[in-house]
A protein has these predicted regions:
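Juxtamembrane intracellular "pre-TM" segments in multi-pass secondary transporters
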Residues: 11-18, 216-248, 272
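Extracellular/periplasmic helix-loop-helix junction of adjacent transmembrane segments
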Residues: 44-75
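Helix-breaking motifs and short loop linkers at transmembrane-helix boundaries and internal kinks
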Residues: 55, 88, 109-115, 126, ...
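Extracytoplasmic gate region of multi-pass secondary transporters
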Residues: 43-44, 242-297, 354-357, 361, ...
């Protein structure tokens, strides 16, 4: 792994990379994100068989995503973000993609809960590289006024991946369970859920060489000349704390909602309306592919539109306005008397719930020096995921087990968690707007 060929910062007046080159990088990052969503999401369709295989309750299953994935994802973010600010980001992403794909496949070999827990840790550590390094790369391919849409396109790959994982994963599990393919020699002795891990982990290996082949972009803007010592990065954060603290706290509400919905909605439909994995996959997957995908891109589009109107705090206002309705629709959806009505409300909840992701990435890149961007992005991911992946999935499980005392009452747990979060985000992001505007006025 070497320093970027053009490690010196690029003067602001130098030409930006071509749009074609920039969007090629967006496409590769999006494909890697789709693969990562498959690897992390397909387990949500395996609640029943995984709990049965390892004799788990809802709390312990929630820990597979909340602790094994969420906590270790965030623990790895900052060290990997540090590497991404010092070395070539294409090598960071390519190597991590190789590792997380292998760990995803190894999840199917787990014979104990501890082994499965550790393989999910490996997936989390690998996937923690993609967003910090990816955001940093995009900020060196697109000028600030045009950064929102590429960020939105990158972020829309997350609901695309989740949607495809629900649809494809549900169909895959159904096929593995009913077709007799599990009697074939390579799969004999394994359960369908184990074979599914082997299959969904493999495609990531095909993308690895492509990242090694792309060109590393020149680092642009303030702070791009040489790697920053850790103390200077700390200074960057502390000097911007009046904006960053409420920003990060507000954006932490987004994964609380998204992971609670992604992990527990399949169980909601199975327990409440007796849907099988294929039905769940098609129902939720199509909503993710349509509403979730459009919402993620809409956040980037709205940010660029607000920016063109002269709003220096455009990313924050776009996120706050978009997410405000998520709590309403998402809180009501689990309480509906029929599955059809629940899906009808879940669609706009996913649209609005995915809006802030591109806004957050854009907001950070616009006020942070170049050689600190991946690290500050990693800090952002650490904070939001400690509140999100480590709290959302586990709290829903804990409330179901210990507050309502009935697995059928998961609808109330999910509704409460979703409904409480969106007004908190709105208040915190509005509080961050004034100090953020001051930073935008001096960032470049």
């Amino acid at each position: 792994m070497t320093e970027p060929t053009r490690a010196g910062g690029t003067p602001p007046e130098a030409p930006w990379p071509s749009a074609a080159r920039g969007w090629l990088v967006v496409g590769l990052l999006a494909l890697a994100s789709i693969v990562s969503q498959f690897d992390r999401t397909v387990i949500n369709l395996m609640v029943g068989p995984v709990k049965a295989a390892f004799d788990l309750d809802d709390t312990h299953f929630g820990m597979l995503q909340g602790v094994a994935f969420g906590v270790f994802y965030v623990l790895a973010c900052i060290p990997i973000g540090r590497l991404a600010d010092r070395f070539e980001r294409r090598w960071i992403i390519g190597t991590a993609l190789l590792l997380w794909s292998l760990f995803a496949m190894a999840s199917g070999l787990a014979r104990t809960y501890t082994q499965l827990f550790l393989t999910r840790v490996g997936v989390a550590v690998g996937e923690s590289s993609l967003t910090p390094a990816g955001f940093s790369m995009l900020s060196d391919h697109f000028p600030p006024a045009k950064l929102g849409r590429p960020m939105g396109a990158f972020m829309m790959s997350s609901p695309v991946g989740q949607g495809l994982a629900f649809i494809g994963g549900g169909q895959l599990l159904q096929w593995l369970s009913t077709s007799g393919v599990m009697q074939w020699a390579p799969l004999a002795g394994f359960e369908p859920w184990q074979a599914a891990f082997f299959i969904v982990g493999a495609p990531g290996l095909l993308l690895v060489p492509l990242f090694f082949m792309i060109r590393e972009p020149a680092r642009r803007g303030p702070g791009g000349e040489v790697p920053m010592p850790v103390r200077e990065v700390i200074g960057v954060v502390t000097s911007r704390r009046r904006a960053l603290l409420p920003m990060f706290a507000g954006f932490a509400m987004v994964p609380v909602v998204s992971y609670a919905i992604a992990i527990w909605t399949p169980a909601l439909f199975q327990r409440t309306w007796d849907w099988n994995p294929a039905q769940i996959g098609w129902g939720i997957g199509l909503l993710q592919l349509t509403f979730g995908t459009c919402g993620a891109y809409f956040g980037g589009w709205l940010t660029d539109r607000f920016t063109r109107r002269g709003l220096l705090d455009a990313p924050l206002k776009a996120a706050a306005l978009g997410f405000l309705g998520c709590g309403l629709f998402g809180g009501l959806a689990p309480l509906m008397p029929t599955a059809g009505l629940a899906l009808a409300l879940l669609g706009p909840a996913l649209f609005l719930g995915n809006t802030p992701y591109a806004c957050a990435g854009t907001a950070i890149q616009l006020v942070i020096p170049n050689r600190a961007r991946a690290q500050v992005t990693a800090l952002y991911l650490t904070i939001i995921n400690l509140m999100g992946m480590a709290v959302g999935p586990v709290v829903v499980g804990l409330m179901t087990d210990h507050l309502f005392h009935d697995p059928q009452d998961i609808r109330y747990s999910l509704a409460l968690v979703v409904a409480v979060t969106s007004p908190i985000l709105f208040v915190l992001l509005m509080a961050a707007c004034r100090p953020y505007r001051a930073l935008r006025g001096t960032a470049h």
